[in-house]
Amino acid sequence: MSNPRPHLLIIDALNLIRRLHAVQAQQALTPAQALIATRANLINTCRKLLAASEPTHVIAVFDGEVHSWRKEVYPAYKEGRTPMPTELREGLNELQDAFWECGVDALLSQTDEADDLIATLATGIAQHGARATIISTDKGFCQLICPQIQIRDYFNKRWLDAAFVEQQYGVAPAQLVDFWALTGIGGSNIKGVPGIGPKTATQLLQQYGDLASLLAACQQEDAAKALLKLRQHQDEALLAQRLVRLQRDIPLGFNLREIRYPPAPEA
């Protein structure tokens, strides 16, 4: 019997945990009770994901106390975001143990953002012809969509696929980075081109294809009004493009054998 084609399940750990905890925090619970309930719910959710996905490999990726390269080049990156509740931050080790209880290893880096680690993992396995499923509500991962990479929004019970991207943004997944370069991403405090909103960005990309072609077109004497805005703010667009594009080539320091599921029994 041949071995099944590898299928890597990648869990955006804090994306999942924060939403599970928010539900418990709305109940009449003490912080300690909310953390206990979150842990129990996390184990239950993790087991559901494993049963539904039937992965051959699985990993939960955490954000560490990262001062990322994005913050270095753009100090306002993610400024204004609601901080994680103190009791949740203090309980993360216990929640990480909950993943291990389910047979799921955890990856945490002090130098790289979880989004870039997830992109590297998914892209790496896809390049070898295997499948990756990312569990997250973060639409930023939609730039990775291809036949080998899919994104599941667990809470809204939907796939963030090419059809979703087309409906939501009017462009293909491969054009999303350039779409956000024009519009910016409010949740990450990334500014795009002033005066270019989603509708105009969609129209421009449908006509020109990508940001490079738009930058060439905006230099023409008879450039349209929207292109003139881009000409005036092309540095902002290029910075936004750099910030929203996920890194896919981070050295990880481990191989697939170490995250096989179910894990090999200890000798």
UniProtKB/Swiss-Prot annotation:
Residues 171-261 form the 5'-3' exonuclease domain. The lineage of its organism: Bacteria, Pseudomonadati, Pseudomonadota, Gammaproteobacteria, Aeromonadales. Mg(2+) binds at residue 115. Residues 195-200 are annotated as: Interaction with DNA. It comes from Aeromonas hydrophila subsp. hydrophila (strain ATCC 7966 / DSM 30187 / BCRC 13018 / CCUG 14551 / JCM 1027 / KCTC 2358 / NCIMB 9240 / NCTC 8049). Has flap endonuclease activity. During DNA replication, flap endonucleases cleave the 5'-overhanging flap structure that is generated by displacement synthesis when DNA polymerase encounters the 5'-end of a downstream Okazaki fragment. K(+) binds at residues 182, 193, 196. This is Flap endonuclease Xni. Keywords: DNA-binding, Endonuclease, Hydrolase, Magnesium, Metal-binding, Nuclease, Potassium.
